[in-house]
Amino acid sequence: IVPQGQVPAVVQPTEVPEAVLPGAEEYIEIGRGAAGEAFTVDWLRSNGFIIVERNWRYEHYEVDIIATRRGVMHFVEVKTRALGSIESAFEAINTTKRTALLHAMRAYTRRTRWASDVQVDLAAVEACLDGSFIMHYTPGIMGGDAGD
């Protein structure tokens, strides 16, 4: 968690908690990316997060999920990959994506007048052939100054 007003920084993932949801056939019907987001919403709710927004857009920026927990606003980027995919979800969060997330985060916190802590989290979802998903959730991949 980075308090408002500090300079953003990239953080390498340390320990990654995992979750597996077997029998997720209802997710498969909507496509891999949307299924990964739906699975992530369910996972977040089951872990005490309150979902505030889904697919929130500002200009040409988008945040997959905005949620709160324990007084912290979480901007969750969801990356869904087939099990064993060559590019990792963490590698997909390049400089351009980090900049876009930062702009969207700042815009959202200005609009909502959110004055508490914010953080960007990564939900790396692996889609298995049997219809199950594996969640690798990395909190705080990037700090953020949401104020201006």
Per-region residue spans from a language model:
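Acidic-basic catalytic patches of nuclease active cores, encompassing PD-(D/E)XK
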Residues: 2-54
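Hydrophobic residues on conserved beta-strands that form the core of alpha/beta folds
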Residues: 51-53, 75, 120
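Structural motif
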Residues: 60, 73-75, 117, 135
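Conserved catalytic cores of phosphodiester-cleaving nucleases, focusing on short active-site segments
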Residues: 44, 63-86, 95, 101
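Short, glycine/acidic-enriched loop or turn micro-motifs at the edges of active sites
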Residues: 56-58, 80
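Mid-chain, well-packed structural core segment of small domains
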Residues: 86-116
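Short acidic/glycine-enriched loop/turn segments that link adjacent beta-strands
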Residues: 58-61, 131
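Domain-level recognition of nuclease-like catalytic cores that cleave nucleotide substrates
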Residues: 1, 5, 111-148
